[in-house]
């Protein structure tokens, strides 16, 4: 092989290795920024056809209704614990911070944080649902399936 071809081959190989390394580093960095959305049912029963459940330590978002009577506030700190539910699942959430003004029992919320164990999330952010037109599609679909009267805003029908 003549020296010119050899140098060109080495240069091409170095560029390919560099691109591969850069791609691997970018993918590794972005991996920690992925937040998957779950409902309480999906956390308890699994998500999708393969019934995949989130693993402890995984970052996620969970959306559901705040269970009436479940909100517990620490009088000395901003720590709040509450439960989220839907048709077939209940999970507990701990949050240390100021809750949104619209947060209340029976209200739809989305908690973003880290899964501590199978049914407990330590939230870093809590968002309260305030209007149907601002609801993410996956939450709207889950709420229509689990709570049809509440999801479409029909206040005349209340579950007993």
Curated annotation (Swiss-Prot):
- Compartments (UniProt record): Cell inner membrane
Cytoplasmic topological intervals: 1-8
**Mind telling me which GO cellular component terms the entry cites?**
plasma membrane
**Principal place of residence:** membrane
A UniProt-annotated Pfam family: CcmE
Binding locations of heme: 130, 134
- Cite the entry's keywords alphabetically: Cell inner membrane, Cell membrane, Cytochrome c-type biogenesis, Heme, Iron, Membrane, Metal-binding, Signal-anchor, Transmembrane, Transmembrane helix
Domain of life of the organism in this record?
A: Bacteria
* GO BP, one annotated term: cytochrome complex assembly
Positions of transmembrane segments = 9-29
InterPro entries recorded: CcmE (IPR004329), CcmE-like_sf (IPR036127), NA-bd_OB-fold (IPR012340)
Task: List the SUPFAM superfamilies hit by this protein, alphabetically.
Answer: Heme chaperone CcmE
The membrane topology of this protein is: Single-pass type II membrane protein
Instruction: Spell out which residues lie on the membrane's Periplasmic side.
Output: 30-160
Any one GO molecular function term: metal ion binding
Q: Where is the composition biased (Basic and acidic residues)?
A: 133-148
List the residue ranges of the region (Disordered).
Answer: 133-160
**PANTHER family given for it?**
CYTOCHROME C-TYPE BIOGENESIS PROTEIN CCME HOMOLOG, MITOCHONDRIAL (PTHR34128:SF2)
Family per similarity comment: Belongs to the CcmE/CycJ family.
Q: What does this protein do?
A: Heme chaperone required for the biogenesis of c-type cytochromes. Transiently binds heme delivered by CcmC and transfers the heme to apo-cytochromes in a process facilitated by CcmF and CcmH.
Can you say what this protein is called? Cytochrome c-type biogenesis protein CcmE
State the organism of origin: Erwinia tasmaniensis (strain DSM 17950 / CFBP 7177 / CIP 109463 / NCPPB 4357 / Et1/99)
């Amino acid at each position: 092989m003549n020296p010119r071809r050899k140098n060109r081959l080495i240069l091409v190989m170095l560029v390919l290795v560099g691109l591969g390394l850069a791609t691997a580093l970018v993918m590794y960095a972005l991996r920690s920024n992925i937040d998957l959305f779950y409902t309480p049912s999906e956390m308890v029963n699994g998500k999708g056809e393969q019934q995949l459940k989130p693993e402890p330590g995984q970052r996620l978002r969970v959306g559901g209704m705040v269970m009436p009577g479940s909100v517990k506030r620490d009088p000395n700190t901003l720590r709040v614990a509450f439960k989220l539910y839907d048709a077939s699942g209940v999970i507990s959430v701990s949050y240390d911070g100021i809750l949104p003004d619209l947060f209340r029992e029976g209200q739809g919320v989305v908690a973003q944080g880290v899964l501590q164990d199978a049914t407990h999330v330590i939230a870093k952010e809590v968002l309260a649902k305030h209007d149907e037109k601002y609801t993410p599609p996956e939450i709207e679909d889950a709420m229509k399936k689990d709570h049809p009267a509440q999801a479409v805003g029909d206040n005349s029908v209340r579950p007993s």
